[in-house]
């Protein structure tokens, strides 16, 4: 299916199953607001958000509950997204209980599976967020989002709070998970080099409006707006292969 989105101000696009769509723009461009509207966390004065036939903006509480199992978000700052009072077992199993998935007695085994999937050792099970590195915390946030087996992940600047070598590790993980699980991503970032390497389609926002969209390489090769051209001119020369090569050199 497709998710048609109209939000912020004349913003309209669709996400196809198994596709990675990059959403780029400067701070204040409306990227995160768009994400929150898609998730049903923020209301919109008009337009629509449709997911597999469901009109999200007019959905009942019960419908939204089911929708939020299928659409999960990974935030920019994992420190703010994780409860510091809980250990990883409680943090990652919380969505299982919220959506009534499986039995509580099976939570430990499921959480251990999720930790392994995101590249974390099982002996972290009873650690709290403060006892983890920034990269480990973001992996926990990803594991938590994956717990309910979503179809769409909205990734809001998932790398920007991390150091460059750790960004490379998490980016590599996200690409692998997308391939292995057939996930659909809306990947929000201000880093064009990263978005270019991970996304099939590219959306460019400025001042709450969509100013460019299309296949990623087409937008890079033939930008349709002056704003996009300016973003490309200002783009650092670091491509995703270079980022990943840096991680390998560092032995990460």
Where are these regions (language model features)?
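Conserved ABC transporter NBD signature motif
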Residues: 47-55
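Conserved ABC ATPase signature
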Residues: 128-132, 136
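ABC ATPase NBD coupling module
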Residues: 1-5, 56-72, 98, 218-223
